[in-house]
């Protein structure tokens, strides 16, 4: 085999063309990782939203909370179910919830309006969802027009500070606290008391009922029991699975766009690698002739130049990873197509995506270097030495 040092020396001797080719590959890799990090972050935000200990109950046939409706009688039936866990005070850990969209102007441009989820909860919701933590202020008091704002909203919408007033549904609502939810979609919601939300939004109807399972392993049994109850027509979902499913449509679209955009850009990067390698082979034809003369097989020449092209691509891949790393943790937002509400989430650049970016770079390098390397391997010794 031809020593790899030969290819490394060749790359170093052509700094400008090597740098331009590597930069082209790096930009493609950065876009590839960035788009996948966007899809990854969106999926992770919704996946964190649910707990495998909880069950969310919707009207039968409803595929989202927005299209569901459940009466007070259903809430009472579920609260009495033996599969429901109880709190330290002996009360069932059940939260009948109102789920509506409210239009709010954005902080950076008040002419832009976004739909934000307003969730009316019971007092038990804070125990049902163990990932919720109040970071500032006090929980809304029962019987008052008070709300708690998710951490992701406080920097994106005005009037969300403690003591400030939000206006929606024809009423003023005082912000009494901020909360986090382990980076989940709940952080993009406004929470208030369900009994305060019901009269101004949808009357005597809840959109969903969430409860904590007494035994998380007994979900199937609880699901069968609830769905077989003739007094109500409901579907029961494990909360974690329900919210993960909500991310599938947009997640797939973002992943598809990532692949399409990077494939288009990759074509340009591959042609750049082809031009670079053809130029390298043309200038080193005598060297190739010498290699063939001293006994190196044509296939070793092919492998050598493929390795050289891949090496340049790896440099580009590393650059692309470095370009993409600062994206990690940057907060952005999009519309959740399942609920038509705005959801804020962070770009999520993982080690897996970085490795995937490097592999993609190597693939581009090998494709771009194959035909020039094949030409080098097929050179006739006499022709090469001229």
Residue locations for each model-derived region?
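Transmembrane alpha-helical interface segments in multi-pass membrane proteins
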Residues: 278, 283-332, 356, 360-364, ...
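Hydrophobic, regular-secondary-structure patches
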Residues: 26, 30-117, 136-138, 143, ...
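Mechanotransmission and gating elements of multispan inner-membrane complexes involved in transport
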Residues: 85-88, 105-113, 139, 153-155, ...
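Hydrophobic alpha-helical transmembrane segments
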Residues: 4, 18-22, 322-323, 351-359
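Hydrophobic alpha-helical transmembrane segments of multi-pass inner-membrane transport and secretion
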Residues: 15-42, 251-287, 310-319, 364-367
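Short juxtamembrane loops and helix-capping segments at transmembrane helix boundaries
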Residues: 328-355
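Short cytosolic juxtamembrane segments of multi-pass membrane proteins
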Residues: 374-386
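Short beta-strand boundary microenvironments
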Residues: 112-156
């Amino acid at each position: 085999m031809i020593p790899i040092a030969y290819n490394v020396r060749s790359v170093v001797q052509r700094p400008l063309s090597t740098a331009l080719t590597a930069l082209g590959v790096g930009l493609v890799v950065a876009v590839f990782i960035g788009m996948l990090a966007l899809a990854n972050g969106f999926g992770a935000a919704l996946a964190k939203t649910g707990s495998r200990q909880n069950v969310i109950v919707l009207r039968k046939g409803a595929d989202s909370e927005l299209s569901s409706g459940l009466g007070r009688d259903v809430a009472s039936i579920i609260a009495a179910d033996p599969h429901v866990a109880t709190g330290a005070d002996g009360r069932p850990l059940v939260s009948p919830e109102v789920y509506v969209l409210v239009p709010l102007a954005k902080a950076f441009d008040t002419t832009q309006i976004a739909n934000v989820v307003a969730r009316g909860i019971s007092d038990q919701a804070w125990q049902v969802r163990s990932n919720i933590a109040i970071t500032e202020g006090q929980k809304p008091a029962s019987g008052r027009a008070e709300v708690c704002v998710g951490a992701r909203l406080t920097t994106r919408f005005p009037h969300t500070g403690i003591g400030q007033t939000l206006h929606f549904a024809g009423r003023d609502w005082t912000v009494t606290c901020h909360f986090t939810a382990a980076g989940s979609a709940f952080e993009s919601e406004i929470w208030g008391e369900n009994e305060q939300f019901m009269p101004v939004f949808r009357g005597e109807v809840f959109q969903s009922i969430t409860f904590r399972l007494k035994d998380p392993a007994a979900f199937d049994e609880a699901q069968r029991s609830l769905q077989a109850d003739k007094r109500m027509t409901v579907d029961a979902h494990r909360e974690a699975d329900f919210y993960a499913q909500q991310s599938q449509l947009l997640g797939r679209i973002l992943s598809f766009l990532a692949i399409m955009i990077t494939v288009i850009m990759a074509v340009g990067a591959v042609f750049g690698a082809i031009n670079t390698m053809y130029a390298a082979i043309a200038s080193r034809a005598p060297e190739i002739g010498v290699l063939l003369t001293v006994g190196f097989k044509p296939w070793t020449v092919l492998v050598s130049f493929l390795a050289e092209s891949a090496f340049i691509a790896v440099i580009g891949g590393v650059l692309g990873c470095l370009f993409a790393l600062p994206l990690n943790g940057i907060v952005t937002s999009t519309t959740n197509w399942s609920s038509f509400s705005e959801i804020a989430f962070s770009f999520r650049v993982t080690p897996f995506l970085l490795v995937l970016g490097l592999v993609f770079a190597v693939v581009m390098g090998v494709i771009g270097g194959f035909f020039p390397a094949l030409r080098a391997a097929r050179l006739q010794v006499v022709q090469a030495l001229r």
